[in-house]
């Protein structure tokens, strides 16, 4: 064999090895038909698929340990802690044990099948192992959405839901743009059109953005308008900002991972805030979208007032340092990834 042939074969081996490495690196956790995704991103709910159903970090023993880690955080993201636990016990009309003792949370996870419990673990991306999964999920999603979307994002989060059989999650709306990935068990999620004013009137959205996270009210007479997704392990669904929904767990333990991000204050958000104060002052503001020029003026005026208030009060205009570090790390990861 001459030297030229040998060098060519060695070069081919290097190219093949590089292609294999890139192929492994591009193996996706979250995926969806690109056309479906681009048409519906932050507009309409749609199904996605994921590869986490058999991952060891999402088995109950690992989740019990994770719950204990989250409960014991010395610097939680939220002032009241990053763990929420509702055991479905009512005393005199109010829920008891909404935030269970830190000592018993791991046991609650292990015994989840026997109760009526709903456990939420927030910002699990702060824990080793889960961080890498979360970052890859976000990068997969942003590959589909278009990498420029990251410029409009304020922060990212991974939330884990562990739910007892047959538990219902009440009707609500969220300010985050999210993807719910079903890992264990099955559940139905009922979505409603956020543009349907019968289902979600303007005043409910206005109160939501300003004073009341629970302002959205379920109206059973419109249940027939719901778009229902039946989630099994390996399936997921996209929930656009402010899309009303409620969930019904199946007759088994459900483990769901919610990958979400929150956009910077948008004209849309500020418009509802401006309309809230106008309505309180006795005006009857037009629904967003009917008078675009007026909408834009109100939104910009509200944004300017908020900026002045932040400066007067000395409030930060960016999120916590750790959240910003997560953001920049994801931006770097996106830049290093090749095309789909």
Residue ranges, per PLM feature:
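Transition-metal
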Residues: 16, 20-139, 278-283, 309-310, ...
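A gly/proline- and charged-residue-enriched helix-loop-helix capping module
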Residues: 126-160
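A short beta-loop-beta micro-motif enriched in histidine and acidic residues
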Residues: 155, 168, 172-178, 224-225
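Conserved short histidine dyad/triad with adjacent acidic residue
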Residues: 159-173, 192-196
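Double-stranded beta-helix
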Residues: 182-238, 243-244
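A short hydrophobic beta-strand segment most commonly corresponding to one strand
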Residues: 202, 251-268
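Conserved double-stranded beta-helix
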Residues: 228-231, 263, 267-340
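Ligand-binding loop in jelly-roll beta-barrel domains
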Residues: 230, 243-257
């Amino acid at each position: 064999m001459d030297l030229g042939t040998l060098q060519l074969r060695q070069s081919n081996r290097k190219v093949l090895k590089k292609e294999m490495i890139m192929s492994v690196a591009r193996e996706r956790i979250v995926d969806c038909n690109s056309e479906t995704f681009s048409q519906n991103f932050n507009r309409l709910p749609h199904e996605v698929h994921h590869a986490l159903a058999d991952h060891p970090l999402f088995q109950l023993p690992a989740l019990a340990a994770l719950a204990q880690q989250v409960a014991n955080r010395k610097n939680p993201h939220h002032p009241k802690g990053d763990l929420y636990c509702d055991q479905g016990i009512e005393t005199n009309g109010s829920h008891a044990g909404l935030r269970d003792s830190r000592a018993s949370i791991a046991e609650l996870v292990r015994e989840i099948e026997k109760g009526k419990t709903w456990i939420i673990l927030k910002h699990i991306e702060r824990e080793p192992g889960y961080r890498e999964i979360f970052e890859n999920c976000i990068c997969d999603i942003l590959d589909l959405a278009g990498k420029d979307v990251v410029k409009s994002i304020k922060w990212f989060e991974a939330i884990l839901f562990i739910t007892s059989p047959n538990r219902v999650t009440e009707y609500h709306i969220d300010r985050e743009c999210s993807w719910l990935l079903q890992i264990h068990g099955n559940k139905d999620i009922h979505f409603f059109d956020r543009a349907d004013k019968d289902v979600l009137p303007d005043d409910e959205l206005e109160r939501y953005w300003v004073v009341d996270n629970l302002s959205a009210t379920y109206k059973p007479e419109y249940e027939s308008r719901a778009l229902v997704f039946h989630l099994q392990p390996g399936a997921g669904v996209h929930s656009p900002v402010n899309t009303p929904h409620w969930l019904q767990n199946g007759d088994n333990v459900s483990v769901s991972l919610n990958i979400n991000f929150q956009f910077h204050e948008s004209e849309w958000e500020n418009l509802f805030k401006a309309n809230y104060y106008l309505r309180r002052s006795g005006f009857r503001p037009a629904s967003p979208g009917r008078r675009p020029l007026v909408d834009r003026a109100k939104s910009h005026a509200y944004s300017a007032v908020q900026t002045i208030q932040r400066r007067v009060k000395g409030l930060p205009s960016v999120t916590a340092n750790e959240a910003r570090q997560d953001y920049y790390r994801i931006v770097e990861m996106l830049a290093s990834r090749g095309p789909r």
